[in-house]
């Protein structure tokens, strides 16, 4: 028996909507990364984009455990301006209370996806919205109840 390898024409993508209200960030991000890659499907093929399209709503209500929210020793995001001494840092709490709270989820998932062209294509299938409204109702997404999968998922 030969190993099955899917062809691009055989790949069927589903649309999922996940409510991130009171969900732990790392647990959600790891599950979303698996679904974006398509590793939850028996027809997974490593060199093809066989993952699903995922819509995450209520991103501003995501939860972090421990001291990660506002503590400087907790979750800190670094960036560099490109100038000498230009390293900047911010905490997850500042990002969540800022203008674009969905960036926390996008960064967490992006850092769990492979860093190549295929990973960029898979990240384009992720749609994160800060509130409960999204413009993808025409795709008829299926609700994925992440909170009920494990009691540790919800905080």
Curated annotation (Swiss-Prot):
Keyword Glycoprotein attached: no
Pfam families: Ribosomal_L13
Swiss-Prot/TrEMBL keywords: Ribonucleoprotein, Ribosomal protein
Example of a GO MF term: mRNA binding
CDD domains: Ribosomal_L13
GO cellular component: cytosolic large ribosomal subunit
The keyword Ribosomal protein is assigned to this record: yes
InterPro entries: Ribosomal_uL13, Ribosomal_uL13_bac-type, Ribosomal_uL13_CS, Ribosomal_uL13_sf
Entry's Gene Ontology BP terms: negative regulation of translation; translation
Quaternary structure and interacting proteins, as annotated: Part of the 50S ribosomal subunit.
Protein family (similarity comment): Belongs to the universal ribosomal protein uL13 family.
NCBIfam families cross-referenced by the UniProt entry: rplM_bact
Functional note: This protein is one of the early assembly proteins of the 50S ribosomal subunit, although it is not seen to bind rRNA by itself. It is important during the early stages of 50S assembly.
PANTHER family the record matches: LARGE RIBOSOMAL SUBUNIT PROTEIN UL13M, RIBOSOMAL PROTEIN L13
Protein name: Large ribosomal subunit protein uL13
Organism annotation: Rickettsia typhi (strain ATCC VR-144 / Wilmington)
Lineage, broadest ranks: Bacteria, Pseudomonadati, Pseudomonadota, Alphaproteobacteria, Rickettsiales
